[in-house]
Amino acid sequence: MEALLNPRYPFDPSFAAGALPAYWVSPRHLAGDDGRLCDVVADSLAGLGWTSLTAVRGRRDFDELGDHHVVRSTVLHISPDALRWAQWVLADEPFHLGGLPVAWQVSARSDTTSSLADWSAYFTPGVPGEAITEFLLALDQCSQPTTLYDGPELVLATAAGNGWLRDADQPHAAAMHPTFTARLSLGEVPPLIQDADPSALTAEGDGQVAMGWQAWAEPAMGAPYLWAASFSASVPHRLVAAFAFSLSSTAPVLRRVLPESTRDQILCAPAN
């Protein structure tokens, strides 16, 4: 649930976002997505010259009120070289991460002859749009979006450089915000995370487990996640580092609405 930053305004979805007062908010990992995650990311991709395609599908549902048609639409954004793409899938009833539906799925492949992605990354609503945009900008600038140049230390060093703390028990695999409200961790990926490289599996016990980066925000211990992100095992660490840099940045972000669950944990200053 989101709430307006200005308490004088009752929460009313009919308000146009542009008519609401703007505030600078920090920390950004608790600032939410301003209710504009689709538009913010789509605008950034358009600025990079990616092509967008909209798929609209319909189905017939039956309930106690009779049958009715439900229209679902997803938007696919494709890079000029067709090696990378991003898809807004929230309306398509996707799977969940941390109890939250996936909103954006970003994928890349090594060549256009393959119909399958080499790796994918997933973001739920609530992820700061700035962090996803930074990830996509780094992806767009990669001449080889599936090549692993750097190790996982780059991700941790990036977050630590912005003041995040390494996990004392996993100093080479996890970092967290000093308030323990957000975490980056290299570990077993959740089910349904797609990755084409079988060598990315790491043997643990009697089976094989795919290891990838996970990130999430938990406003309070045991509270529902504010957002979650998952990167499959073959996502280049330098791209995750770009996401981590933006996520852990101490610079405030512009917001008009914020998550109800973090209103007591953020700092706000009028943008004007």
Q: Which residues does each PLM region occupy?
A:
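Long, compositionally biased intrinsically disordered terminal regions
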Residues: 216-222, 230-272
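Surface-exposed beta-loop interaction hotspot
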Residues: 111-172
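Ser/Thr-rich, low-complexity intrinsically disordered terminal regions
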Residues: 53-82, 166-183
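Amphipathic alpha-helical segments
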Residues: 32-56, 131, 150-165
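Surface-exposed interaction/gating patches
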Residues: 146-208
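Terminal, regulation- and interaction-focused segments at domain boundaries
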Residues: 2-37, 137-147
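Intrinsically disordered, low-complexity regulatory segments enriched in Ser/Thr/Pro
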Residues: 80-133, 186-241
